[in-house]
Structures are given as structure tokens and as C-alpha cells.
């Protein structure tokens, strides 16, 4: 039987590593999605929100584990994650088939 070893913080690269989906949210502002022609874009997702919040509020070293289509939308979400101060060391990139049958953001 193996023994669980808990390392000290100075021996770890990250204080928290979140595993989950990161989504792109399109916000129409005051109008309705159906009639809007301009949107603000935001990143979000339960696990990612925790990682970003701990980074912003407490300065913890956080990272996210997720997978994205290797296209402009996926790279946009990656940029948002980096702007939030969360490490992207563990992101996985998947080939995009052009229509979202095999992978999508």
C-alpha cells in the first residue's frame, strides 16, 4: 500500500490545479441575444472561476486542466485565461474538423 505524501507549498508549482471545462460567454449587454449584433466575450466555468478567483483575491498560483479545439476561438479562450493570471501549462489542444463534430469550444 502506498503512502500519501503531502508536499510543502515551496515544493509545488501550483497551489491549486482546477480540472474542468472553460467556456466562452457572449454577453449582448442590455439587449437580447437573438437581436444583438455586438457582444462582449468572457471566459467562465465553475472550476476555472475558482482558480481565477483564488489567483485574484489571494495571489495563489493556480492552473487549469482543460482541452480546446486548436482554432481562433480556442486561442481566444487561452488568452482570457492568461489575462486572468491562471497558468495554461496543462491545456490540451485538439485538431478542429471545421464543423465541431469531433471537437468544439
Tell where the protein language model's regions lie, with residue ranges:
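Short secondary-structure capping/turn segments at boundaries of alpha-helices and beta-strands
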Residues: 5-6, 50-52, 92
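Positively charged, low-complexity intrinsically disordered leader regions
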Residues: 1-34
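Alpha-helix C-terminal capping segments
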Residues: 42, 51-61
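Conserved donor sugar-nucleotide recognition element shared by glycan-biosynthetic enzymes
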Residues: 43-50, 73
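Conserved N-terminal subdomain of the carbohydrate kinase-like
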Residues: 61-105
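Short pre-catalytic strand/loop immediately N-terminal to key active-site residues, enriched for Gly-Thr
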Residues: 35-44
Amino acid at each position: 500500500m502506498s503512502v500519501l505524501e503531502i508536499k510543502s507549498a515551496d515544493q509545488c508549482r501550483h497551489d491549486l490545479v482546477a480540472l474542468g471545462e472553460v467556456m466562452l460567454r457572449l454577453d449582448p449587454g442590455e439587449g437580447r441575444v437573438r437581436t444583438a449584433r455586438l457582444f462582449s466575450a468572457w471566459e467562465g466555468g465553475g472550476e476555472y472561476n475558482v482558480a481565477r478567483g483564488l489567483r485574484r483575491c489571494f495571489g495563489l498560483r493556480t492552473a487549469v486542466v482543460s482541452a480546446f479545439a486548436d482554432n481562433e476561438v480556442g486561442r481566444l479562450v487561452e488568452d482570457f485565461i492568461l489575462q486572468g493570471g491562471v497558468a495554461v501549462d496543462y491545456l490540451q489542444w485538439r485538431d478542429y474538423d471545421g464543423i465541431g463534430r469531433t471537437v468544439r469550444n
